[in-house]
Amino acid sequence: MCLVSQEMRKLAPELDPLRIGTGWKKEDLGKVQVMVESTYGDSHPGSGHLNILVEEVRKGIAEEGGFGARYFCTDICDGESQGTDGINYSLASREMIANMIEIHANATPFDAGVYLSSCDKGVPGNIMGLARVNIPSVFVPGGTMNAGPEMLTLEQLGMYSAQYERGEIDEEKLDWAKCNACPSCGACSFIGTASTLQIMAEALGLALPGSALMPATSPDLLEYAKEAGRQSVRLAKMKNMKPSDIVTMESFENAILVHAAISGSTNCLLHLPAIAHELGIEITGDTFDRLHRNARYLLDVRPAGRWPAECFYYAGGVPAIMEEIKQHLHLDVMTVTGKTLGENLEELKNNGFYEKCDKWLQEFNKRYNINLTKNDIIRSYDNAIGTDGSIAILKGNLAPEGAVIKHTACPEEMFKSVLHARPFDSEEECLDAVLKHKVQKGDAVFIRYEGPKGSGMPEMFYTSEAISSDKELGKSIALITDGRFSGASTGPVIGHCSPEAVDGGPIALVEEDDLIEIDVMERKLNIVGVNGERKSMEEIDEILKERRAKWTPRKPKYEKGVLRLFSQHAASPMKGAYLDY
């Protein structure tokens, strides 16, 4: 067994004394050396507890005869920066996390890695980093927070805030929601981007079976972290067990089918393609659309369903979802256990995993005085909530490269409609118009110049919540943007409209009272009229040519710093919006 760490010790005589100065003992220097990288920090509840898991990982590494070194690059929280210019840094932060992992792993020699994170950009940033570094690796999901009183979860704050702005609730009720929505550490308790990406990590075969999205307060999570440490040392001693050996196109297809089954966040269409890019695999929006068609949607968890995210684990987690859709999965793909996916699923049936999950479900039932069963949370294949996946890629003269809609969270009344365009060049203007009812039934509200190159691709969460929580507007208008949406977003919202406005995409050419055709089942998104009147598609093409000739590109929004770099080099949202140097 040839260890990179030991070869480098021969080349760099300063390495040993520097590590001893960091707290290593002489006997540690010759062991398998594992980088334990996490997003631990006080940035948000999803990262605040990871130091505890890091120490469990290190214990597991030590038990298997290795030594674990701690490295940190904390992430930011979309929720904390929501509605401010801070949200513009969110997607770019994913790239910076991946870059720091590359730097940490390549500047100092390691034989394996364990990566811990919980949330929106921390999880994909870590997975992109581990794929780029490509040493034997295990990912540890940080789990989900518990629900609060009355089963309150954070994604409901947008609704409460909009209700308060409209005078429907008082300040006391809003304050109650704020003080109770996040009662513990962990990712927010709904199938948003954080939860979706934890699930994707396991579905790709990079996390231990059954480890995704368990409650962050559970003692089970500590044991999973310790076992991940043990497994990293084992992987370092095995051949052909690097991330590039484990994760294949078939692995991504499995993950996307799981994404369909859970009605996962639309932000996954940014993250899985970016991860795939690091591995030399091409995943696009079209890949998602192909696999979501006729796929079973099974998970009755918020925001599209009824229950908080902790219930996902109580119902059996990723393995239970995979068992239901097993006939469509590639069961021969390799995983970090050193076994195939099929072998892992069979082992879980016999090792008490499902019995343990059910025990936690009974505890949850007692807490809220209800009587949920596994099938109330994860439907059977034959009793699916839906049979056409959960997202669709719409294309047409408004989005030649595509735009994404989560149709499982959209009122069916909006699946096929022709609306009147109301374009805005900032979210602030649009939100003000929605809250003051300056938009009306039958409008298609546009927020543009918010793509990766435009402003960093922030979320349009407050505007989408203001629309979906309005009893009239939520079923009668649509929001279309080249930006993105929170994983908590619901309603008739269409994002990632590509090409983006700053690149001269058709969304930049939309004018007041254009007629906008949305057809979810036919996957269409078109401008079909101007000034409120229908036109032929040939006429529309000529009108768009005339508008393009008059269109003037905007000056770059950022003149320096990270966002200048990101806006100059970001790829299309349909390819993952990664830094394409």
Where are these regions (language model features)?
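Well-ordered mid-protein domain cores that form the structural environment of catalytic cofactors
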Residues: L91-R94, A98
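A short, small-residue-rich loop immediately preceding and capping a beta-strand
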Residues: A105-N126, V138-P141
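Catalytic or ion-coupling anion/metal-binding cores of large enzyme and transporter domains
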Residues: M1-G46, L53-C73, G79, D85-S90, ...
